[in-house]
């Protein structure tokens, strides 16, 4: 099922019993977090708070609170279908040369479809039905959540930030949290390696002292939102990828005050600039690790204009100790990652990011081992192949007889197939999430790889143990008489 905009998605979710309208007043200050957290942990529906205390704009929460709703948002009928999206991305990331004319002809429709999904720019857009400018701009009109009691201020969480570097042909989409610090100012918390920060740095180098145009879309359609957090190849824009997911071209509109193009059906658009050198201390905030992060300095985004649909919906979330929405997103997107990794490393049989590992800080890989040192090659490949795993602190590699998604299996492999000294790989001075206060230096820390595979000659001089396997014939005989044994 495909969705043309957020409202269409909300309507379809409600028809499926996957969305609940909350018609009593609930405050965006702490209360919505509590309601959403309980609902997410119970694998409950998306929530539309129709009467946020003190506001006229409804709040949509827990939208991607189950892997199934993430899959729906990406146009898939089930989580398992996300593997097909991963296969498409793997092909687009590194397309294989055709083996012949027939093979080339079979691949032609894919490239035709990609070309056909180039974004469509329109003039009259729903997101510009209402325009607020100048001194009338006031972010206090938005029911921005204060998620935790120790949070310093309200926090915009699902803003889709649109930027464009001076030397780039296409725009960058990124989701960065934004602390509200005034009527028309927020702090843009983007890390130095993220696309928005790179665009800003290039702008400052080419246009020193000049304001950097930025736009933020709130409440875009689900395909566009999820496209921004998916490992899309550099050769494919997030807008075009969203079109592939939606099976229809993404409609864009030029902003009123800059040349950036934003989703035409988004609920709310913030337009403005970042003045080079204008910085502010951001935080502390409770984040996806389950802790409050330390205060750090980031650029200030000045909002010059707000445009929105008539009767807009404000899309929001919270982050905290897993499970939270980012963790659920990680569970679903895990299925997209597997084919991409397998394209580069065919020996990988499964890849799993445990949600309790904060979505990306730990990975478990199962593989068909073929030679001594093979597991170490795979773990180094995981760290280096996709940008999404540059912050993964722990990689556990096991044989393919282990279920990567069953901790009983994984712990058994670690404790029976590993020597702590021989089979542990430590790498120092690597990129680490700035939110990781356990690292000795902000943004720089170590990584650990655990080789929990069977050891080959050359890796050990000892006779390796054989796994105990039950006798199939005996198992079948006992199955046949089990009910007669009277064992409950």
UniProtKB/Swiss-Prot annotation:
Pfam families, per database record:
UbiD (PF01977), UbiD_C (PF20696), UbiD_N (PF20695)
**What is the cofactor note?**
Binds 1 prenylated FMN per subunit.
Catalytic residues (UniProt): 287
* Cofactor(s) recorded in Swiss-Prot or TrEMBL: prenylated FMN; Mn(2+)
> What keywords tag this UniProt record?
Cell membrane, Decarboxylase, Flavoprotein, FMN, Lyase, Manganese, Membrane, Metal-binding, Ubiquinone biosynthesis
Q: Which residues bind prenylated FMN?
A: 175-177, 189-191, 194-195
- Membrane topology of this protein: Peripheral membrane protein
* Pathways per UniProt: Cofactor biosynthesis; ubiquinone biosynthesis
State if Membrane is listed as a keyword. yes
| A GO term, aspect molecular function | metal ion binding
Name the chemical reaction catalysed here.
a 4-hydroxy-3-(all-trans-polyprenyl)benzoate + H(+) = a 2-(all-trans-polyprenyl)phenol + CO2
- InterPro entries under this entry? UbiD, UbiD-like_C, UbiD-like_N, UbiD_bacteria, UbiD_Rift_dom
- The EC number on file is 4.1.1.98
Residues reported to bind Mn(2+):
172, 238
* Entry superkingdom: Bacteria
GO BP, sorted A to Z: ubiquinone biosynthetic process
Q: Where in the cell is it found?
A: Cell membrane
Per its UniProt entry, what is the enzyme's top EC class, as one word?
lyase
Q: Which GO terms describe its cellular component?
A: cytosol; plasma membrane
Its annotated function is as follows:
Catalyzes the decarboxylation of 3-octaprenyl-4-hydroxy benzoate to 2-octaprenylphenol, an intermediate step in ubiquinone biosynthesis.
PANTHER family for the chain: 3-OCTAPRENYL-4-HYDROXYBENZOATE CARBOXY-LYASE-RELATED, FERULIC ACID DECARBOXYLASE 1
Instruction: State how it assembles.
Output: Homohexamer.
The family annotation for this protein states: Belongs to the UbiD family.
User: What's the protein called, per UniProt?
Assistant: 3-octaprenyl-4-hydroxybenzoate carboxy-lyase
Q: Which organism is it from?
A: Pseudomonas fluorescens (strain Pf0-1)
Give me the gene this protein comes from. ubiD
